[in-house]
Amino acid sequence: MGCGKTEAALTAAEELMAEKQLDGIFFGLPTQATSNGIFPRIEDWFDKFAGAYDKFGIMKLMHGKAALNELQEELVDGVHVDEERESGVLTSQWFAGKKTAILSDAVVGTVDHFLLSALKQKHLALRHLGFSKKVVIIDEVHAYDAYMDVFLSRAVEWMGAYGIPVVLLSATLPKGIREKLIQAYLLGQGKGIRTRDKKKYASIFQSEAYPLLTYTDGGTVRQRRDFTKEEDKCVVVRRLEENHLEEMLETLLANGGVAGIIVNTVGRAQGLFERLVKVFGRDVSLLHAKFIDTDRVTKEKVLMDNIGKDAKRPRRAIVIGTQVLEQSLDIDFDVLITDLCPMDLLLQRVGRLHRHQITRPEGLSIPILYVMGQSDTLSFEEGASAIYGDYLLARTQKLLPKEIFLPRDISPLVQSVYDDTEIHWDEGVKETYKSAKKKHAINIMKKTNTAQNQFLLRKPHLKIKPDKYNLIGWLDTSITFDSEENAFAQVRDAEESIEVIMLMKYGTGYGYFGKKEDISGQVENYKVAKEIAKQTLKLSSSIARFAFGNIQKTIEWLEEYNRENLYSWQQQPWLKGSLGILFEPVDDRKTGRFYLGDVILLYNYDIGLQVFQNNKKKI
């Protein structure tokens, strides 16, 4: 957590590439946003690496919207290369295809592309070939659930069979998952840990040191714990009832400062924003996943400019957000308020508290974490319960100390929640906890079984038996997915969604939200069409159910709407196949309204997308 994991991984990659004569890396992250965020950093590293060896390297950003990334566009066909330059980074149109992109020397993308190497599907051999000459680096490993872990473990096992180095990064990884992934790699090599050797490795797999480096050396597991120790930071933990929030913020920010509020759902974030903006006005800002992509990028940039490293900080600010604030954003809060969530994620959020060495406003010199949403009866907020389950919330609440010493306490706290050690509960909640524990176990089992039955690639077999194990039967019972997005859906246990392009009506035409310029006559312009293609937001299957009963009927309605209103888009490569919706301006003209079946969609730059049905907010 803030101790240079990325730099360490890239240094390891350089050594491994040299030792094993490999050509590049694959750097995988949980989301498109985190992939975009680290892409310039990896491009700069790879440019220097290629230059040091006097060669060109082909680099690619790999996710569904990579073509819209400005740096990726600059790299296309060697924009960085001139006649006098003999090394560096470029890309090539040949590698631009979805199937061939993985063959580039250096690839940054969403982790899905790595997980797909464990899914039976067409072109699987090509995907494996793409990984065969790379060091694989996967960041934020703690962010993947039990369903994705099945594909992650199998993919790691195949990398072990090929002898491909894999570097896994996390500040808050439960030790059980650490052991499982190490075991998977060794099994791939045909060197799994035997039962009689487990005692020998007990101290390694049970270690709660931080920082910690665990690695395989042939068939042996080794560990390094003797790193330079940074001084522990003491974070004070306090319980906060939400009805005291405004009063608490008034007191905390009396002399200025930046408060972060991280909650578990978009709906809660929007509700708090509407409450607090009445008291604190323009000092309040909001960030979550339900903004148009371009708006979210703008908001993230403003956030980094205001409270990132070496930023000129505002006198007073309140930043409200969801889980997007806990992943890969190098921002700093003077005080942090958070919803209760599982311990590993809670510590990720704490990583944004007093992150940088700066002078703090009076009264905020000590890092304090306020936790909302705790329940003495273990009846947690509905959204938190749905996302994380009551079992992990209950254990986190029970085991959360009044003071956290970072980084010393990171691993012990995470392990205490995930190791299933029995906890003493009062009689009044004992049965509630038992029920939550049982539900958690069933949920994990369901996710694991579903993933294993979801076209999971079989284990690698090192012994050659042409009559039994061969490429001809490799993909028996595989499935042909009609799009890459549908393939991705098989390796993520995520809710289905519909991606739409959202624009505002202006007169008889349409344009971008907040711009008040009609661009409907400029769709044939390459740059305009590309900018339109960036105005996307995903509508969840829940919205589709409220609108038309199910997601398929919603898609069919949107397709008909586009044939009637946006037919010209089908002639433009950037927009062909896209689903657009045109919002009607409301009152202030900053807010747009769109009627989608039985629901009303409202959108504006400050609060994002809201969904109403019968005058009640639904999502």
Residue ranges and their predicted role:
Residues I42-V107, V111-L115:
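A substrate-engagement module of RecA-like helicase motors
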Residues A101-A118, A311-E326:
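Conserved two-lobed SF2 helicase motor
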Residues L129-V135, H142-Q223:
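Post-DEXD/H (motif II) to motif III coupling segment of the RecA-like Helicase ATP-binding lobe
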Residues R178, D232, N243-K309, F333, ...:
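C-terminal helicase lobe and adjacent C-terminal extensions/tails of nucleic-acid helicase motors
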Residues G188-A269:
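Conserved interdomain linker/interface between the two RecA-like ATPase lobes of SF2 helicase motors
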